[in-house]
Amino acid sequence: MSRLRAKLKNIACVVLLCTALALTYMVWSYTMGVSGMGLLRRAFGVEEQETALYPGYEEMSYATRAVTPLSCAVRAETGAGLYGTTDRETASACFEKMGAVLAEALETAEDPSPATSYQWRDALSGTMVFMDFGGKVPLAALARLMGAQPSESMQGAARYVVLAVEDGTAVLYYKSDDRTILRCRTEADAAYLISLAAEQTANGYRFAYEEDLADAREVLLLTPQTSVPEVTEHRVLDTSSESDYDRITKDVLEGFGFNAYMPRVYNESGGTRVYVEEERTLRVYADGHIAFQNPQEETAAGYAPDTEEQTARIAQAAQLAYGILSSYLGDAELFLLEAAYNEETERFCVRFGAECGGIRILGERRAVAVCEFFGGELETAYIDLVTFRRTGANTGIIPAAQALAAAPYTDGFGLYYRADGETVHAGWYVEKE
């Protein structure tokens, strides 16, 4: 009996020893490579999110909103009138309607070739859909956001896209500026495009070149409306109470992945408040500008992201920008201004602008949100906490012909809002890069 007890005791000791070793290994595996702050996050149930190559539904929905055109125009057939969208909402509805045939065009596009302004105008004069995205949208990323596999030919970016029917074939035209036009044949369903275009009723819109305006831009869309909304600009933090400031700051911190209750905080000159968590720094300036820094190792090497990674980075940036700004932009909406890789800095930069009623808002900084990625990591970001409100109707816009006659040049000429402090002026301006 004593021998049996001894054997059982030995077995129990071995089991306890193995259990202790297993628990030690589990704890070591769990904490390996994790800082003290990271362990505290885990203890409080706040797990850091790993960089995802394939964005989730929420990120994709934000990115899709960002690449919705600011305006669209549709012509049913040669000689027919033009249908134009009156704001971003109607442009979104038109874009959604044309989405399937556009996605098919992006998926089946052949190698692009240069086109002339005469070919561009011919395309606009026949059965077609015209889209102005407001910024330079990478076509491959646009295709992926629309659920399509982009053609290998779709490597560039475009602000203006036209899908036209020529000799029974759907042909894609696109341009990122006022000069370079590219054209490619596609296998998109031309008959379906014709049927969709026929559903739109002309509502008085015209392209400027149709009005015989001298040196008119081929992309300048003239509206029959005689007024545009008056818009005012307000800095979010200028009039916020202490409790509002704390709430806004909490939203911003959580938007950037900080634990709002744990970072180290100190003040700099000029009323700037600085939040530090590990290597990451967030500065909230008194005027409402937000600057985020997450320095990467100097020994790391950047690289040009492929189309999948570009789409993922755009989606990640869109989720961040919309998540922070959507509660404060007021009557304005974000749009993708640019998403491009800089070979010199080895950074992939995503910029968002603001529009109101489908009209771009120009300002000193051009972008209200900027995200810069090094490799797969968000390294720096800039957010402008600003609100735009419609306050009435502006009926003092001069005719386009007069504005064109007075313009120093036509590249970038269009109807914009220009933010100047608290005042936002609507008028004909030349957009500067």
Question: What residue ranges belong to the model's regions?
Answer:
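Zymogen propeptides/activation segments of proteases
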Residues: V14-L17, G156-R185, A190-L196, Q200, ...
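Preferential activation on post-signal-peptide N-terminal prodomains/segments
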Residues: V15-A312
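Short low-polarity hydrophobic stretches
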Residues: A20-T24, I314-A321, V368-V370
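Short, non-transmembrane alpha-helical segments in secretory-pathway proteins
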Residues: D87-A109, H234-G257, A304-T345, F388-H425
